[in-house]
């Protein structure tokens, strides 16, 4: 089957699953604010769990107590686009590449991040962008 015969949503399936988890965690977090403590705490043993959990947590409230939509929205749109591109161009390697980008950003953040609690999937978004850009140059793929 040719890639052009498959609908675009087939490539968006796994990114949408990841985002659905993020949005469910975010909705839960709007009720229980202390959930974001499971982010990455650089160079602290208690922060190691954040290497796995931090991409799923996004800020839920602004300082005035109102709901903060910006963090999760600003991660969701680029993740959907870049994640779908990863599936499209690297269908057989998608999970392997995503795993290493996911773990790599968490380890990098734990090793070199500021001494604060870090949450959100921005690191994965930047890693996806970097990977797709650099691999495009290496492969000389104009798409």
Residue ranges of each PLM-predicted region?
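Membrane-embedded alpha-helical segments of multi-pass membrane proteins
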Residues: 73, 77, 121-130
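Membrane-interface helix-boundary motifs at transmembrane edges
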Residues: 3, 87-94, 138-143
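N-terminal TM1-TM2 helical hairpin plus the immediately adjacent luminal interfacial "cap"
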Residues: 14-98, 103-118
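N-terminal membrane topogenic signal
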Residues: 2-17
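Basic, gly/Ser/Thr/Pro-rich low-complexity segments located predominantly at protein N termini
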Residues: 111-114, 125-128, 132-135
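Hydrophobic transmembrane alpha-helices
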Residues: 83-87, 130-139
């Amino acid at each position: 089957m040719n890639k052009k015969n498959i609908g675009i949503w087939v490539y968006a399936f796994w990114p949408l699953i990841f985002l659905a988890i993020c949005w469910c965690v975010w909705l839960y977090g709007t009720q229980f604010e202390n959930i974001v403590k499971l982010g990455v705490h650089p160079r602290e043993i208690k922060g190691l769990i954040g290497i796995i959990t931090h991409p799923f947590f996004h800020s839920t409230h602004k300082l005035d107590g109102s709901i903060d939509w910006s963090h999760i929205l600003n991660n969701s749109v680029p993740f959907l686009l870049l994640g779908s591109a990863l599936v499209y161009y690297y269908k057989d390697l998608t999970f392997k590449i995503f795993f290493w980008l996911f773990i790599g950003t968490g380890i990098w953040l734990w090793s070199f991040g500021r001494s604060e609690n870090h949450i959100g999937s921005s690191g994965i978004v930047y890693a996806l962008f970097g990977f797709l850009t650099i691999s495009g140059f290496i492969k000389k793929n104009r798409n």
